[in-house]
Amino acid sequence: KFNSNNQENIAVSNGLEISQITTGQDKTTHFKHQYPIPAYLIAISVTNYLTYNHIVDNNGSPFEIINYVYPESYDDAIESTPVTVDIMNLFSNLFEEYPFSDEKYGHAQFGWGGGMEHTTVSFMGGFSRGLIAHELAHQWFGNKVTCGSWNDIWLNEGFATYLSGLVIENFDGVQSFNNWKQSRISSITSQPGGSVYILEDNPSSSRIFDGRLSYSKGALVAHMLRKQLGSNVFYESLQNYLADQNLSYGYAQSDDFIASIEETAQVDLTEFFDDWLYGQGYPTYTIEWSEPAENLARFVINQTQSHWTVDFFESKVTLKLNGTNGESQTIILDNTFDGQEFFQTVLFNISDVEFDPDFDIISKNNQVVLSLTSNDIQNDISIFPTPTNNKFKIIKPRDLTIDSLAIYNTAGQNITTMKYKKYIDVRDFSSGQYFIKFYSDKGLIFKPLLIK
């Protein structure tokens, strides 16, 4: 309610405007919002706004995006806000229909920097695409499902930040998205510690709204979860999280989120979240690779950690192999322990190996080195027959001494280790591709083994 002598004043609040009633010198504007609303998302603003709207088709059930802007900002705003419709459509396609589509969405300009994601109307200090995307994203992650405590603020801010990155991915392309991730990782790893989840009781506002941890690291952990699960399962899991009747239009804590994701994905994510959500810091990788011998290349992944709270960061590691004649091959290795070995079929000579070319892992100061293992001895051993279904013979020169051997599967898991013998029985092995590592007096020798 305000004095109508200022006839140009317009009020905005949550939900739908129901009426304006002028009585004498007073004008009263009524808004109605029919959803449960967290106290910090209640919004009221009155000033000499100019208004204009955009229409979201919403699959035949249209609703308005109403923009309340200062007269002096009108020309710039009306050029900047139409993209809101495109972003709304993107988020609706990835997750679900806008949660308040039977009311409205809107922007109300205010005099602070940044924005505030009040339910159905975000207060905006400007109209950049990134800010529009971030505040709109909160209508799903923060408003429909709200963090259950300030310790869980990443469920709001981490996901809103990640969704602004998804706008870059979908509107600007892969390279721009990679640049965005690289910039975030640089910020995250600028300090050796810090967890996404806020560990301390009664955290300060500066810790709650820490841009490095709650926003950037929260966003990259969301992205790493996507890479861990695969995009299809990731988006399906988030759709189910938002639709969960125990959480929607209510509150969720991190444990609720994890349980919801695990239920859809049908996978135990305890180790992932212990490392990346509750643990502090980041890994540093050293990747050792060998030139292919008999089309078999070996990769060893070593890791150190920046903070003592995590003894090892489990993650899927992507390597891009570049060939001497312009060939390329991308491999994804599920790294679960330090010093893990992987064997991959590579049909060309490798010139160099790129670690995490798309910036999908929070890490820093990584190295890729060529193994000192000599290929000169790789042909000293042969296996016959291959493929085999019962046993195979190891053929070697007399002057080569083999102490022991280990057989690995394609995931780098050690299936068995044994002392050297001329004939190896594999009748109990499942069919598939394996790799043998021989410990000889001349060095390590690697051979592929195919079991039918």
Label each region the model flagged.
Residues 375-384, 388-452:
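C-terminal outer-membrane/trafficking sorting elements
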Residues 285, 289-336, 342-354, 403-407:
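Beta-strand-rich binding/interaction modules
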Residues 1-133, 162:
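Hydrophobic helix-coil surface modules that form long, contiguous segments used
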Residues 157-220, 224-228, 247-248:
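Acidic/His/Gly-enriched intrinsically disordered linker/tail segments
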Residues 361-371:
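Short, compositionally biased serine/threonine- and acidic-rich segments at solvent-exposed termini, linkers
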Residues 122-179:
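Zinc-dependent metallopeptidase catalytic helix centered on the HExxH motif
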Residues 211-299:
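Amphipathic alpha-helical substructures
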